[in-house]
Amino acid sequence: TSSAASDVYKRQPLASGNITLLNALIFTSILLFLGSSLMLYFSNILTLLITTFGFIFYSLIYTIYLKWATPQNIVIGGLSGALPPLIGWTAVANEISLLPLTLVLIIFLWTPPHFWPLAIDRIDEYKKEGVPMMPIAKGVARTKIEMVIYAVLLFGASLAPFLYGLTGIFYLVSTSL
């Protein structure tokens, strides 16, 4: 199905035809090269590798394949959106440690209960587009149950930084509110 067929996508420059695929690829390549060069210059190779993984995972694996292949698309694809705390941490510390990984987990678990209400609200647009979002593939009732499950897991994961001794009482109180 053409992305231009849906209200969700028709205003995007590629779908509307305002930008050609070749021009988009050239512009993306320039930004990728410049951004990667700056990332490496101002931080380190570990940060560049994690950032590159996130870029490839989102732009190729999620956007081209997962989005169209599985109702778990935003769950799996949410990994790339959860990486910024790890990227920021490695830019400063040049190491991977438990605290930023718990933050990645928190954002990862936050994504489904955050996004699925939008998918429910726009279910007709996703149906028209042929995107197998959870509410379409498994039904709205099942999606709501999974949202609650993810919210419970999210609450538990939000306590992890305190329970592992990575943060103090202020974090625990603010997280529990």
What do the PLM-derived regions correspond to, one by one?
Residues L66-G77, N94-P100, I120-V131:
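A cytosolic-side transmembrane-helix exit/cap motif
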Residues N18-L25, Y41, I45-L48, S97-V104, ...:
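Membrane-water interface of alpha-helical transmembrane segments
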Residues I61-T70, L86-A93, P113-P117:
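Juxtamembrane membrane-interface segments at transmembrane alpha-helix termini
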Residues L86-I96, L154-P161:
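Hydrophobic alpha-helical transmembrane segments in multi-pass integral membrane proteins
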Residues L103-L177:
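C-terminal membrane-associated helical module and adjoining short loops/tails
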Residues T1-A5, Y9:
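Single conserved hydrophobic/aromatic residue that forms the stacking wall/gate
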